Structures are given as C-alpha cells and as structure tokens.
Design a protein with these regions (language model features):
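Short hydrophobic alpha-helices and adjacent helix-cap/hinge residues
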Residues: 1-139
C-alpha cells in the first residue's frame, strides 16, 4: 500500500499543537486520530478539526462525534453487535460451558461513518457503493 506512519512529538501548549499540525500537514496525505488524553481536550479539538479541514487533509476521526464535527470518517462498531455477542457468551456459560475454551472475540460487524460535507469540501468523490454501505452519512 505504500503507507508510511510519521510520528510528530507534540508539546501540549497554545503554540505546540498548531506547530505539530503544520509540520504534519506539509508531509501527510491524511491524518489519523488516535486516543491520547494528553493531546485531546475540548480546548484542542477545534484546532485538530480545523487544520485538516482548512488544508484539505482528510482526518480520520476518533469516533462518531468527531465525524459529525468534521472529520472525514471513522471506523466503529454497531454497539448492538458486541451486546449480542456478550449475551450469547452468557448463555453458553449458563449452559455449563467452561470459560477456558472461549477464544478472544472481536466485534463481528465493524462499521464506518462518513461526513459527505467534508468530502465535498476536500473535493473527494465518494462512490455510491461506499455511501450506501456506510452505517451513517453526515450531509
């Protein structure tokens, strides 16, 4: 795929975050948000969303809320799916199965959520197939 991950250390300050975003923006084709309590707060969220939006750099958000606020998309899961899986495991335990034999499980149905308005702003074309397959599309 030719992907290269670039890590930019961020000094959390009024000047530190914008400087890191600017440095990334000059070399990145997209930005991936990862959970980091030291970088993300209500004070930094606006800058984190605005820089990629203004510079037409796709930002892969942390959650549905980030997509609703302007990131291009996020990968998530339908919360009913892990709930159903948990209920099925509980039934197996109640029926006497030993928990030692249960393999590690992951959500069966990952989903993605798109922000079509952001895609249009960035002049990105999203196929009808992707739009139809999305769990939610913010327009």
């Amino acid at each position: 795929m030719g992907l290269k991950i670039v890590v930019i250390p961020v000094v959390i300050s009024v000047k530190g975050l914008p400087a890191a975003l600017k440095q990334l923006g000059s070399i990145a084709d997209s930005l991936l948000g990862i959970v980091d309590k030291s970088s993300y707060s209500s004070k930094t969220a606006k800058a984190i969303l605005l820089y990629p939006f203004r510079n037409r750099i796709p930002f892969i958000g942390l959650s549905r809320a980030w997509v609703k606020s302007g990131s291009l998309y996020t990968l998530d899961w339908d919360y009913a799916d892990p709930g159903q899986q948990s209920a099925n495991l509980a039934l197996r335990i109640l029926n006497g199965e030993k928990t030692k034999i249960f393999p590690l499980q992951f959500a069966d149905k990952p989903i993605y959520i798109l922000n079509q308005k952001t895609a249009k702003h960035m002049k990105l074309e999203i196929s009808q197939e992707l739009l139809e397959g999305s769990f939610k599309v913010y327009k």
